[in-house]
C-alpha cells in the first residue's frame, strides 16, 4: 500500500494510519493544510545504499533459505554478515573470474558512505594495499561424485553442495551429529 499526498478528513486519517502501521516501511505524518489532514509518505531505506542505487537483490528461494540457514549455523547476527563471509571465502574464484576481488568494491562502498554523509562529490575508490588473508576453505563449484559430507563439516563442502543440503531442525541435526560421531567411532 502506498500513500502519496492523499488528503483525508480527520476521522479517516486515524483509520488509515493504524492500518498502515502494520505494513509499513514508511512513515505517515499529518500536516495541517486547508481541507483537513493530509497524509504524506516518507520512504526511508534503513540500509546503506551502494553507489546511490536504490535496488534490491533478488535470488532464488533455495539460495535465500540456505543463507538464512548458514546465518544460524555460523552464528552470524545478520544475513549480510553471512553474505560477506561467503564472498570472502569465494575471493580467489572471484578474482580468477573478474580480474579483481570484492576488497576493492567494499572499499568503494566505504568511500560512498563517507561521501554521502558529508554531502561531497564522489571520488574514485582508493586501492587497498593490505594483502588479503588466505581463505580457510576454497570455493569448489564442482561436487565430486560419491563423496558424502558430514552434517556440520561445511568448511570442506563445495558451495553448491551446501545449497542443495536440505534444511533441518535443531533436533534433527543434533540426532544426525550424534549418528555421525557414532559412525566415526566405529570406523576408527
Swiss-Prot record:
One of its GO terms (cellular component) is nucleus. Residues 44-53 have a biased composition (Basic residues). Transmembrane segments: none annotated. GO terms for molecular function: DNA binding; DNA-binding transcription factor activity. The keyword Transcription applies. One of its GO terms (biological process) is circadian rhythm. It is found in: Nucleus. The keyword Phosphoprotein does not apply. Keywords: DNA-binding, Nucleus, Transcription, Transcription regulation. Disulfide bonds: none annotated. Residues 116-136 have a biased composition (Low complexity). Residues 43-97 form the TCP domain. Residues 26-53, 115-136 are annotated as: Disordered. PROSITE patterns: TCP. This is Transcription factor TCP11. It comes from Arabidopsis thaliana (Mouse-ear cress). The lineage of its organism: Eukaryota, Viridiplantae, Streptophyta, Embryophyta, Tracheophyta. The gene is TCP11.
Amino acid at each position: 500500500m502506498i500513500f502519496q499526498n492523499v488528503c483525508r478528513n480527520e476521522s479517516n486519517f486515524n483509520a488509515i494510519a493504524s492500518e498502515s502501521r502494520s505494513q509499513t516501511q514508511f512513515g505517515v505524518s499529518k500536516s495541517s493544510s486547508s481541507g483537513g489532514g493530509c497524509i504524506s509518505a516518507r520512504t526511508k531505506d534503513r540500509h546503506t545504499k551502494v553507489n546511490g542505487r536504490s535496488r534490491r537483490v533478488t535470488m532464488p528461494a533455495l539460495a535465500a533459505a540456505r543463507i538464512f540457514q548458514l546465518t544460524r549455523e555460523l552464528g552470524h547476527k545478520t544475513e549480510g554478515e553471512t553474505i560477506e563471509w561467503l564472498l570472502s571465502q569465494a575471493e580467489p574464484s572471484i578474482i580468477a573470474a573478474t580480474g579483481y576481488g570484492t576488497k576493492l568494491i567494499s572499499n568503494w562502498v566505504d568511500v560512498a558512505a563517507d561521501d554521502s554523509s558529508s554531502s561531497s562529490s564522489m571520488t574514485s575508490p582508493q586501492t587497498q594495499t593490505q594483502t588479503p588473508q588466505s581463505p580457510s576453505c576454497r570455493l569448489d563449484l564442482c561436487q565430486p561424485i560419491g563423496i558424502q559430507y558430514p552434517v556440520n563439516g561445511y568448511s570442506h563442502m563445495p558451495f553448491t553442495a551446501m545449497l542443495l543440503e536440505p534444511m533441518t531442525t535443531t533436533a534433527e541435526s543434533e540426532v544426525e551429529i550424534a549418528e555421525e560421531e557414532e559412525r566415526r567411532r566405529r570406523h576408527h
